[in-house]
Amino acid sequence: MYPAHLLVLLTVCVSLLEASSIPARPLNLYQFGNMIQCANHGRRPTLAYADYGCYCGAGGSGTPVDELDRCCKAHDDCYGEAGKKGCYPTLTLYSWQCIEKTPTCNSKTGCERSVCDCDATAAKCFAKAPYNKKNYNIDTEKRCQ
């Protein structure tokens, strides 16, 4: 399939999604995942962070279980602050580069910059924090009160 055809198909799909009652999927998760891979040099799959501790993944409550979980809570809080400014963090696309294994935001202003900064800071934090396998897929009802 030609790139132009893919662009048209993507445009139609996004238009249909916006017109439907189906809630939109987070569009920037792909970018955030790539930032994580940039920062951790591909040492750990992005999905390893999707269900970690009390804050990595959807939602979050209680006390973070470790340093990595604190990174996720800080990321959630950063998205919350961006939301207070009228941004939609999970839907905001931004410009960034991986420079010497460091996520670097190119977006200069507004929601794009705010959300990019949230994601870049979290990706760098993830790369520095130890990953404890026993905190993956924990029972959040018991451990995150």
Swiss-Prot record:
It catalyses: a 1,2-diacyl-sn-glycero-3-phosphocholine + H2O = a 1-acyl-sn-glycero-3-phosphocholine + a fatty acid + H(+). The active site is at H75, D119. Residues 1-19 form the signal peptide. InterPro entries: PLipase_A2 (IPR001211), PLipase_A2_Asp_AS (IPR033112), PLipase_A2_dom (IPR016090), PLipase_A2_dom_sf (IPR036444), PLipase_A2_His_AS (IPR033113). GO terms for biological process: arachidonate secretion; lipid catabolic process; phospholipid metabolic process. It comes from the Eukaryota. It is an enzyme of class 3 (hydrolase). Ca(2+) binds at Y55, G57, G59, D76. Expressed by the venom gland. Its EC number is 3.1.1.4. GO terms for cellular component: extracellular region. Binds 1 Ca(2+) ion. Keywords: Calcium, Disulfide bond, Hydrolase, Lipid degradation, Lipid metabolism, Metal-binding, Secreted, Signal. It is found in: Secreted. Belongs to the phospholipase A2 family. Group I subfamily. D49 sub-subfamily. This is Basic phospholipase A2 notechis 11'2.
